[in-house]
Amino acid sequence: MKGLKFGIMALVLLMASSLSAQSIKESFSAEGRENWKPEVTVRGNLGIYAGGFAVTGGVRIDEKRTLGLMVGKNVNVYTVRHGYADVNSFSAALYGRRYLHLGERKIFSFYSDLALGAAVVTGMEGAYWVNPVDGTTKKDDIDVEKGDVQPYFSWQPGMRVRFYKNIHLFLGPTLSSHCLGVHLGFGF
């Protein structure tokens, strides 16, 4: 447990170390903006009772940081009286990514993504059942309804491997308000 706490603190400090006022000022100056490059990733999330996919799009403001927008489709599985119910949602969040490159060629990199936004429940499947006694439709006790807005938070640390030119593989754990599991994705 101490190792997990130490790892979380180390990654949070890694993200915070990139937020010095001078480095932000340099990245957003006229000269710094000339070096901005687009960065897009597509990733899938798989957890114990959740799954989905996300697309991120942003700008790499320097060699170590990316800022952008993350949108995704999430499915959470709830255990209900008659089996399982799927709650579908759509999320949008602002995210920041911090890289720690290994070696001069930057083939391998550790990264940490932090995202904060909102998720809207778009529908439910399996939450409704027909009462065999009187034939009425019942809804199981799930505390969400279609149209509900929920806070969305995600932390995805991991390893990035560059394959060819600017094509990368992303792999690591996912700790979010909608998924506890792993993620795998590609970026360019």
For each feature predicted by the language model, list its residue ranges.
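Cleavable N-terminal export/targeting peptides
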Residues: 1-35
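Short glycine/proline- and aromatic-enriched beta-strand/turn motifs that initiate or cap beta-hairpins
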Residues: 21-73, 97, 183-187
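Surface-exposed loop/turn segments flanking beta-strands in extracellular/periplasmic regions
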Residues: 27, 32, 131-138
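Residues that define the transmembrane beta-barrel architecture of outer-membrane proteins
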Residues: 34-38, 49-53, 86-92, 108, ...
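Extracellular loop and loop/strand-boundary signature of outer-membrane beta-barrel proteins
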Residues: 41, 79-85, 140-145
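Short polar/acidic secondary-structure junctions
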Residues: 45-47, 101, 174-176
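Gram-negative (and chloroplast) outer-membrane scaffold detector with strong preference
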Residues: 56-136, 156, 161-167, 188
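Gram-negative outer-membrane beta-barrel domains
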Residues: 146-150, 154-188
